Amino acid sequence: VKVVILAGGLGTRLSEETSVKPKPMVEIGGKPILWHIMKMYSAHGVNDFIICCGYKGYTIKEYFANYFLHQSDVTFCMKKNSMEVHKKRAEPWTVTLIDTGDDSLTGGRLGRVSDYIKNEKSFCFTYGDGLSNVNITDLISFHEKHGKDATVTATYPPGRFGALEIKGNQITQFTEKPKGDGGLINGG
């Protein structure tokens, strides 16, 4: 199973971070959101990724081009212009990076990577800026069992503000950022 990850949007709500990098490259715990998403899939044995690059996509390409170097212990001999790798840390991933355009929308990005998934029985398709605790193995099994064209993971959006319950002029309950209005949204 391959995973197609959307990583081309502008990320306007994180403008202080995304003025220099795409939103999937914003770091959590010293690693890009994109890395965390890929680790989640990899934990379920899914290691073949197609990244739909767009806005500042070169930063994603540079990240993966230098990934092995950054994850390994190395010695550089400046005199000989050589490098010796001591401890190698690598992921079992295959990562295909496709420039899908700066202004493409979801369908356009999927269309531009269609040649890379055309021989797949099914594939996973997710956003490059959302983390979850979805059991990927169970999700794929569910999809295969039901034999539909698509399976959508739904979630309740978090509320944006704390909610107060007031009786008379007294606060009787406070709930910090309750789940949204009860409507499910597409979680990827």
Model-predicted regions and their roles:
Residues 65-93:
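Short mixed-charge
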Residues 1-66, 97:
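N-terminal glycine-rich phosphate-binding loop and ensuing alpha1 helix
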Residues 10, 102, 128-130:
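Active-site metal-binding loops of divalent metal-dependent hydrolases
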Residues 64, 131-188:
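Conserved core of the sugar-phosphate nucleotidyltransferase
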Residues 101-108:
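A short, glycine-/small-residue-rich helix N-cap motif at loop->alpha-helix starts
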Residues 47-48, 121, 149:
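Short acidic/polar active-site loop segments enriched in Thr and Asp
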Residues 110-122:
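Active-site nucleotide-sugar/metal-binding loop of Leloir-type enzymes
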